[in-house]
Amino acid sequence: SNFLCRFSTKVNSSYFHCIGGDKLVYKTLGQQLDETAYNHPNKEAIISYHEGKRFTFSSVKDVVDKLAANFLKLGLKKGDRVGIFAPNNMHWYLTMMGAGKAGLVSVGINPAFQAPELEYCLKKVGVKALVTAESFRCQQYYEILEKICPEIKDSKEGHLKSKNLPNLKAVIIDSQDKLAGALKFNDLLDCSDKDAVQKVINMQSTITADSPCNIQFTSGTTGQPKATVLTHFNLINNSYFNGKRNETENQRLCVQNPLFHAYGISVCTTAALCHGATMVLPSDGFNPEASLRAIVDEKCTTIHGTPTMYVDLIKKQKELQLPIKTAEIGVTGGAQCSPHLLKEIKDVLNLKKVKNVFGMTELTAVVFQTMMDDDEDKILNTVGLLHDHLEAKVIDLDGNTVPFGEPGELCIRGYSVMMHYLNDEAKTKETLSPCRWLHTG
């Protein structure tokens, strides 16, 4: 029960409710984008360092409204799924925002997947439109698509008819070349149909915060990946509260984590949106040298990464000796830091503070987090304090709450708990109790 380290040892039961100070917010992704663009119009929202692209919040809003309008013109309707099968780049970010603005559900798909894994994901959630890159490392995405959807070569763009993938109607590729049966992503970033754009603006009040916004696939360590459905309410609130603890407001974030993962979305993408921070994508996939150069060139103040990423970052910095002067905070999750790694993060990367986050896909992302004033012992040996407005308990095999300090299964209840696993009622019932306690296993 090391996550309960802050609770008084006088507590008899390992149940805790973190009441919190700030209120929960009832907003959609689109409403949050509109609000941030209004409050910080000229602040940079996202910089894709490796692509040489950058957008302010006002320009993101403008482009996203047009992209959302074009999604609807393709025949997509509220609740339809838009798959994103791509590495970290600008079109990933814009697609997620555009889907949210149009009342659609974005689906992050691991860019390293091969044809069978991609096919499983597309079928599992019934993806209607797929946005993808041209290539990533050794991956040639059009060739992968041809294997599972051979009709693409002879289809009219936006009107795909696939026997194997009957739900898939549109493939959109971020490419300069025109590929048979596919739309070009850049063509969807402009829309001369002002009525269509106005329709997107008008529909914002009809999209509820409780409606699905994003689907995350679990890692699938015990079978096929499950499709975790997250709402706008899940995402905006989890991002707001983890961003607040990370002091994200006005920061410039170096984001090394993959965007298809819950960490990349909640702790980075929407946290930056909620707090008016700038997000920097150093490379399409993790590259320590690109990260270091982006940190220096873009004056990043916060670095996000897993412990293994920090190990590689430190090794490369010892070699390059770049002048890291602006970075102050390192945020890590996925595994505990060793004392040696914590010391090197501070000494070699010249950071003042290191923070731990702990969570899981079914909980939107983060549910425990260390505080800015935590000492080294808490950073190394705990995952910090429970998030505001959440409940936690530890239970035994019979479902009884164990005494404080005793081992057992962690359960969480509150705003960040997923809606359900899509098309998987049995697994949902296994994981979510009738009282909405999520069993972490």
State where each predicted segment sits.
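Conserved adenylate-forming
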Residues: 74-76, 192, 196-211, 215-256, ...
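Conserved AMP-binding/adenylate-forming core of the ANL superfamily
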Residues: 25, 45-97, 114-119, 186-193, ...
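Gly/Ser/Thr-rich phosphate-binding loop
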Residues: 186-190, 277, 300-305, 314-378, ...
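Conserved AMP-binding/adenylation subdomain of ANL enzymes
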Residues: 235-252, 260-302, 312, 316
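Structural core segment of the AMP-binding/adenylate-forming
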Residues: 1-2, 104-190
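Conserved ATP-binding/catalytic segment of the ANL
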Residues: 74, 85, 400-405, 409-441
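Flexible, low-complexity linker/hinge segments
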Residues: 18-27, 179-212
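N-lobe entry segment of adenylate-forming
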Residues: 1-74, 78, 123, 147, ...
